C-alpha cells in the first residue's frame, strides 16, 4: 500500500528511511509548538486553543503535502507572518484577531486561485530576485527586534527610542544563553538544536524558580475559543488590503523558495530545472493555510527545516505523513508548551532571524539601484513594525531608482503597477 501510494522504490528509499527522515524534520521544526502560542497569545487569543490549532494545522498541512504532491516537505504556521499578525495587524493597527484571521483566510484563498490558474509563475517572475531576498531579510530583522524585546534585551527609551534592558535580571541572561546554545548546537549539526535550546532555558528557569512548572502531558485543550472565529467581512475593509497583500506575497515567495530549495536537495528537480507537481504542492499549501485560519492560527506554510529530513534520506510524501502523525501526538504536550516563558522562545526567534538575513550575501552591492531598494526594504520592516510597509517601500524604491536612472528595461508592467498602487495606498489609505 505504501509503495503504491508513495512510489518508494522509484525514489530509491524505504519505509524505515522515510520514518527516520520524518522524525528528523519534526525535531527541527517542533519549536513552533512553543513559539506560535507565545506570539499569537499576545493578541488575547486563548493559548491552549492556539497550541491545538498549531498542531492540527501542521498535521493537516503536512499530510496534504504528502498525499497530494508526494513531497518530503512539512508545513506549520510560518515564522514572521505570525509576528506580523500579532504585532502589526492586531497590536499596532488595532484590528481584532478575528479580523486578522479573516485576512489570513482571504490571502490563502487568493493563493489557492493563483495556484489553480497558474498565475503564480507570472507574479513571482515579475519580482526581482534581490527584492525577494530583501523581503526575507527584512522579515528576519523584524523578528530580531521582536526577539530582543521579548527577551528584555531591548526596551523602550524616550530619549533614544530604544535602549539596553536590565542585564542583571535572569530573563535577558537566560535568553542570551539560549541563543548561544542554539548556535553552538546548530554548528555541531545537532538535530533539533532550536527545540533543545528552548527546553534547556525553560528547565533552568524552572530550577531557578523564575518560571512555574505547569506539567508535561495532559488531554488536549479545547479548540473552541478560536475555531471558526475568523471575521472575513471585517477583513474586507479597505484598510486591510495591504495586510492581505503582505500575507499573500510573503507566503508566495516563501513557499516557492522553500519548495525549490528542498526539492533541489532531494534530487526532485527535472533536468531542465523544472519542479514536477509544483502546482499540486502550492495547492496543498494554500489549502492548509485556509484550514489553519479556520482552526485559529496565522498562515500555514512550507518549512525550510524539511531539508534536514531530506538530508536524512527523505524523498517522498511518507516523510511528511510521519511529521503529521508526530504533530498529532504533540497535542498531548500542551502543559509543557504553556510552561515555556517568552525569554526561552526569544532565542529561537533570533536564530530564525539570522537564517532569514542570509540572502543579503547574494545582493550585488556594487549596483546602487539594487543596493538602495534592498536596504530600504529590509530596514523599513522593523522600523515601521510592518512587513506590509517594508514591501511597499521596497517596490516603490526599486521602481523609482531604476526609472530615474534611465534603466526602464529592467522594469516590468507588474512591478510598475504594484508600485503605483502602493503609492496610492500609503498616500491616501494608510492605516
Where are these regions (language model features)?
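Helix-loop-helix hairpins and the membrane-proximal interhelical loops
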Residues: 1-49, 162-165, 195-279, 420-424
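Helix-loop-helix junctions within the multi-pass membrane cores of secondary transporters/permeases
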Residues: 2-36, 57, 78-136, 264-360
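Hydrophobic/aromatic residues within the transmembrane alpha-helices of Major Facilitator Superfamily
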Residues: 23-30, 60-63, 67, 148, ...
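Helix-coil boundary and interhelical linker segments in multi-pass alpha-helical membrane proteins
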Residues: 38-50, 88-99, 238-241, 341, ...
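Loop-to-helix transition at the N-terminal end of transmembrane alpha-helices
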Residues: 44-63
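Juxtamembrane transmembrane-helix boundary signature
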Residues: 58-79, 110
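Membrane-embedded alpha-helical modules
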Residues: 93-207, 321-431
Amino acid at each position: 500500500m505504501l509503495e503504491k501510494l508513495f512510489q518508494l522504490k522509484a525514489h530509491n528509499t524505504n519505509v524505515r528511511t522515510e520514518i527516520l527522515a520524518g522524525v528528523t524534520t519534526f525535531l527541527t521544526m517542533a519549536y513552533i509548538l512553543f513559539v506560535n502560542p507565545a506570539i499569537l497569545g499576545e493578541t488575547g487569543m486563548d493559548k491552549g486553543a492556539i497550541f491545538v490549532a498549531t498542531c492540527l494545522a501542521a498535521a493537516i498541512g503536512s499530510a496534504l503535502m504528502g498525499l497530494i504532491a508526494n513531497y518530503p516537505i512539512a508545513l506549520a504556521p510560518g515564522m514572521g507572518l505570525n509576528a506580523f499578525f500579532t504585532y502589526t495587524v492586531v497590536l499596532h493597527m488595532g484590528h481584532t484577531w478575528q479580523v486578522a484571521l479573516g485576512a489570513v483566510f482571504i490571502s490563502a484563498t487568493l493563493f489557492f486561485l493563483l495556484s489553480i490558474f497558474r498565475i503564480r509563475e507570472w507574479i513571482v517572475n515579475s519580482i526581482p530576485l534581490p527584492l525577494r531576498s530583501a523581503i526575507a531579510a527584512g522579515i528576519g530583522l523584524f523578528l530580531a527586534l521582536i526577539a530582543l524585546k521579548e527577551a528584555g534585551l531591548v526596551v523602550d527609551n524616550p530619549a533614544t527610542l530604544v535602549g539596553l534592558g536590565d542585564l542583571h535580571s535572569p530573563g535577558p541572561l537566560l535568553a542570551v544563553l539560549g541563543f548561544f546554545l542554539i548556535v553552538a548546537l546548530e554548528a555541531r549539526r545537532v538535530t533539533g538544536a532550536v527545540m533543545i535550546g528552548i527546553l534547556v532555558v525553560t528547565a533552568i528557569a524552572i530550577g531557578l524558580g523564575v518560571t512555574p512548572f505547569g506539567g508535561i502531558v495532559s488531554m488536549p485543550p479545547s479548540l473552541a475559543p478560536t475555531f471558526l472565529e475568523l471575521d472575513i467581512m471585517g477583513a474586507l475593509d479597505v484598510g486591510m488590503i495591504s495586510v492581505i497583500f503582505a500575507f499573500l506575497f510573503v507566503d508566495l515567495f516563501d513557499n516557492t523558495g522553500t519548495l525549490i530549495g528542498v526539492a533541489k536537495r532531494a534530487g526532485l528537480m527535472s533536468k531542465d530545472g523544472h519542479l514536477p507537481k509544483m502546482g499540486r504542492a502550492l495547492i496543498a499549501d494554500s489549502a492548509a493555510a485556509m484550514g489553519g485560519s479556520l482552526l485559529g492560527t496565522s498562515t500555514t506554510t512550507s518549512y525550510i527545516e524539511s531539508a534536514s529530513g531530506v538530508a536524512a534520506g527523505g524523498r517522498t510524501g511518507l516523510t511528511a505523513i510521519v511529521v503529521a502523525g508526530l504533530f498529532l501526538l504533540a497535542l498531548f504536550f500542551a502543559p509543557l508548551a504553556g510552561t515555556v516563558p517568552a525569554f526561552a522562545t526569544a532565542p529561537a526567534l533570533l536564530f530564525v532571524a539570522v537564517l532569514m538575513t542570509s540572502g543579503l550575501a547574494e545582493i550585488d552591492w556594487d549596483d546602487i539601484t539594487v543596493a538602495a531598494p534592498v536596504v530600504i526594504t529590509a530596514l523599513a520592516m522593523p522600523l515601521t513594525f510592518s512587513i506590509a510597509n517594508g514591501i511597499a517601500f521596497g517596490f516603490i524604491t526599486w521602481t523609482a531608482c531604476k526609472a530615474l536612472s534611465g534603466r526602464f528595461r529592467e522594469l516590468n508592467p507588474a512591478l510598475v503597477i504594484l508600485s503605483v498602487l502602493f503609492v496610492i495606498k500609503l498616500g491616501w489609505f494608510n492605516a
